[in-house]
Amino acid sequence: MPPKPSGKGQKKAGKAKGAPRTDKKRRRKRKESYGIYIYKVMKQVHPDTGISSRAMSIMNSFVNDIFERIAAEASRLAHYNKKSTITSREVQTAVRLLLPGELAKHAVSEGTKAVTKYTTSK
């Protein structure tokens, strides 16, 4: 014998079937961030160190700023050479132009390593 439905589960009269619900909670829009990647790199370099949300926000702004600068410079270089595609060569040159001395060398070597790893994994 099937169980009897309680008063709570019964449908209420007066509401049209299939009508859109207005009392649903709105989903918050996702905010993209480099936070998890910054955290992973920090743990590789300093495993016993933490980071505050304010410091993470500053680091995220820094990464966004550098990304925009490199992208703009690489775009400019492609335009100067009458190319419609930004390749790793333009990005590498942009990094050399934007970052000072030793920092540029390290960035280029890490970038080359990342591109090589990506192409071999395909």
Swiss-Prot record:
GO terms for cellular component: nucleosome; nucleus. One of its GO terms (molecular function) is protein-containing complex binding. The keyword DNA-binding applies. Keywords: Chromosome, DNA-binding, Glycoprotein, Isopeptide bond, Methylation, Nucleosome core, Nucleus, Ubl conjugation. InterPro entries: Histone-fold, Histone_H2A/H2B/H3, Histone_H2B, HISTONE_H2B_site. Residues 1-31 are annotated as: Disordered. Monoubiquitination of Lys-117 gives a specific tag for epigenetic transcriptional activation and is also prerequisite for histone H3 'Lys-4' and 'Lys-79' methylation. The modification N,N-dimethylproline is found at residue 2. It is found in: Nucleus; Chromosome. There is a cross-link at residue 117 (Glycyl lysine isopeptide (Lys-Gly) (interchain with G-Cter in ubiquitin)). Glycans are attached at residue 109. The keyword Ubl conjugation applies. Core component of nucleosome. Nucleosomes wrap and compact DNA into chromatin, limiting DNA accessibility to the cellular machineries which require DNA as a template. Histones thereby play a central role in transcription regulation, DNA repair, DNA replication and chromosomal stability. DNA accessibility is regulated via a complex set of post-translational modifications of histones, also called histone code, and nucleosome remodeling. The nucleosome is a histone octamer containing two molecules each of H2A, H2B, H3 and H4 assembled in one H3-H4 heterotetramer and two H2A-H2B heterodimers. The octamer wraps approximately 147 bp of DNA. Belongs to the histone H2B family. This is Histone H2B, gonadal. It comes from Asterias rubens.
